[in-house]
Structures are given as C-alpha cells and as structure tokens.
Amino acid sequence: MLLTWLHHPILNSRIKLLSVRYLSLTAYMLLAICPIAVRLLELEDYDKRCRCNNQILLNTLPVGTELLKPIAASESCNRQEVLAILKDKGTKCLNPNAQAVRRHINRLFFRLVLDEEQRIYDVVSTNIEFGAWPVPTAYKAFLWKYAKKLNYHYFRLRW
C-alpha cells in the first residue's frame, strides 16, 4: 500500500500516523486534552495566587461575617488581602487599608482590660502573630492613652 502525504510517497504501510485521518484525530485529541490539563494545573495553583483580583474591595465588614482571614503578600501575589468568611460559607474581599477592617484586626492584637483587684485599666497583648499583618504600635499607643484617661477619671472620682 502506498501512502502519500504532501506528494511524497511513503512505502511503509505500518506508518499510519502520517495519514491525514490519524493526524486530524491526533490534533483533535491534543486540542481537547490540553485545555483540561491547563485548567487542572490552574486549580492546583489557585491558593498561591491573588484571591481578590477581579472583585470589589469592601470598606466595611459585611453583615453575617463569621471570621476575618488576613493573607500575607507572597511571591505570586504581591499585595496583602483580607477575606471575610460569611456564615453562609461565602467569602467577600475587604480593603485591608480601610479603617473599619484595620480596627477589627487590631483588636485581635491588644485588649483593654479592667484589673478587678486594683481597679485600673490595662492594655494586654494577646500574643497573636499574623504574617500578613504588622503589629499595630499606633493602636497600642492609642489604647494606652485611652486607659490612662479612664484611670484618671476613675481615680479622680474616687477621691
């Protein structure tokens, strides 16, 4: 059997890959399988990329927020992100520079606590560390100033 491809005679009948029918079948299989393989590889790499690329960043916490998840900047995503996990298992992207978001995350680092024995307010560190979030020294200074003001009013009224 003499196969021809591009007007060149091929004498070996066992080489069927060069026939037009098998080439078109091979091309079809590659075109069908390659996008599926690329899609699977993209899904594996999903956690390493930015999650809030094409979403609107909210400046306040949405209603039904269960927890906040700060995400550090990394090699594949060069910006800091904050995800709000909702009670209905949905997620929303928050603006990490918004005042309301920063206030809620800063509350995780330091607390203003009333010492019952001495009856004074004190700022306590919770010793939580996020790689995505620097320890807010300005918020700690604000809490110390507020505690000092509360202690002053308490002791002034007591005497």
Swiss-Prot record:
Disulfide bonds join 50-77, 52-93. Keywords: Disulfide bond. The keyword Nucleotide-binding does not apply. One of its GO terms (biological process) is defense response. InterPro entries: Chemokine_IL8-like_dom (IPR001811), CXC_Chemokine_domain (IPR033899), Interleukin_8-like_sf (IPR036048). The keyword Disulfide bond applies. Transmembrane segments: none annotated. CDD domains: Chemokine_CXC. One of its GO terms (molecular function) is chemokine activity. It comes from the Viruses. One of its GO terms (cellular component) is extracellular region. Belongs to the intercrine alpha (chemokine CxC) family. This is Putative viral CXC chemokine 2. It comes from Human cytomegalovirus (strain Merlin).
